[in-house]
Amino acid sequence: MGIEIERKFLLHDDAWRSGVMRTLHLRQGYLIDVAALASGLARASVRVRRQDDQAWLNIKAARTGIARDEYDYAIPLADAERMLDALCNGVIEKRRHVVPVEGVHFEIDEFLGSNAGLIVAELELSAEDAPFPRPSWLGREVSDRLRYFNVNLIAHPYCTWSAAERAGDEAC
């Protein structure tokens, strides 16, 4: 069993782009989606993710907070493509830019398609209270805002958000 401790932030500006170490292309969908989670019929999301030439099945506890149970299993690329195309209710595509800052790797997710325009920074920590650098481009924390969870972006894509929601000013 693994515990993922992850924090998510909006960005002030594009200054992070000058520090990009590498960029990956991700395509992901959910076998258990936001409707099942919201109704209480499921206690975990089940995600299929393709990242460049690799693929995983991911199971993540539905509870909120920055620490959640998470399990990742490598799967054949062909299986992932078939699941994404045939079994998922929508797919999210994004570019993930890895930006190292003082020994910490920030993952900047730049969403595509109906979520184009949404850019968030994520980082994984070893403990909930672990210190981390706060570069000038790092904005408001949205770790506890359900609106920003990837599983929600399929049913409620960024292109449908109001100006207040896009600014992170409206409760989720």
For the regions a protein language model found, what residue spans apply to each?
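Phosphate-end processing signature that detects enzymes handling 5′-triphosphorylated RNA
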Residues: 1-172
